[in-house]
Amino acid sequence: MNGLEAAVQAAEDAAVSVRTYVPGYPITDLAQALRCQISVNEKVALEIALGASATGLRSMVVVKQVGMNLLADPLVISATHGIGSGVVVLVGDDLGPRRSQVEMDSRFYAPLSELPLLDPSRPGLLHASLLEAYTLSEKLRIPVMVRVTSQLLAAQEENIPSRPLPSTGQRLEKESWSLTAKGRHQRHHDRIMALAQEASESSSLNQFQISGDVGIIASGHPASLAQELGVSVLALAYSYPLPERLLRRFIDGHRLILVAEEPEPFIESILSQNPRIKGKLTGHLPRGALESSDIIQALEKLEGRPDKMPQAYESVAERGYEGVCPDCPFQVLFSSLAKVDAPVAGDAGCSIQATRQPFCSADVAYGLGSSAAVASGFSGKGIALMGDYALAHSGLAGLINAVWQKRDLLAVVLKNEVAAMT
């Protein structure tokens, strides 16, 4: 069973009734295997899930890392306003990134929203983490996040038994409305996060492997890599909140510690005041995704300062460029825009192809659906280029704003009736 299949089994075991998603690598295949309902954008996807939760239905939201930016508003608010039945946000980080406009570490949304995040390392732990996430979500009445990567979804593991988690039918309680926003936040700190901290400390999903005086603290896929090296490893179930007592015991029992995580030094930055802690911040490990060879080399040089090697920035020519689809009907449009004497705003959908060879006709491309708002900020006339999915996702708001402000722009919508850049 691979990680994708383990997640599907967990959703069935947990009797998850409402499943929403927004397509995007690396979670599109996962969401379709989960039979999720596509949503117009990530904010709406989470809001549907919150509504289902309030009325007693377990729900799951599946998004890629950049989707966390859009659903942050209801996510942060739901932490203190409470929920009914369990809500899990299953987020896929595109490490590399292969099909994203930016590399992001979604774990940073956990302390921002003050919500727990589990970061499993292999398919069996992904299955168990999802069940634990629903149990914790209903106990604390808050959403819980679980992070996956393409490596985890593709990893294989045998004998992952089904473990049904019957639905509780728990509905939203209205007691939150008796408190002010300040009072809800106080309660969240005093009661909810204290229970989340204890869940992180006592989770049976934390894994120990003791061997020698050098230890590795790891989460996610790097934990599975570290466990193959025959050294001491503490594989964390939760990236947030971190199990402080567990970490202290492990660190105190070892002379040096390497923190292996990806893509950013999220855990290391919390532990970095201890000079025995090494990792990405100290230059022992590279930023971004990790391979076994990275961890092995770091262990070999853990005693001293790592060699500072000049870094070559990855180029499109080096990595390779997929290009537009051979039968893309918009190639003539992209070529024609290069001849127009006006700035062109694309976005993260198919219109991003206009920024590249052989067209080079779009000047800027930010988030999905951003082109109308960006073009309305140009100093003079401008052109906004977006797909029909980008228009529905968030582009319509930019168009309404441009009309209201009487901005001089031409909006071109690429109608292909599909979210193709996923």
Sequence positions of predicted segments:
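Short, glycine/polar-rich helix-capping loops at beta-to-alpha or helix-loop-helix junctions
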Residues: I27-A31, R99-R107, S224-L225, L242-L246, ...
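Short helix/loop capping segments that flank catalytic or ligand/cofactor-binding pockets
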Residues: L71, R98-S100, A154-E157, S224-Q227, ...
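Flexible, low-complexity linker and terminal segments
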Residues: M1-S17, P120-V324, P329-L333, A338, ...
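A short acidic, amphipathic alpha-helical/loop segment
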Residues: L30-A33, I48, D73-I77, L225-L229, ...
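Conserved beta-strand elements of the Class I
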Residues: V18-T20, M60, G215-I217, L258, ...
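Short beta-strand segments
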Residues: V62-V63, V88-G92, M145-T149, I217-S219, ...
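Thiamine diphosphate
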Residues: M1-P123, Q151, Q273-T422
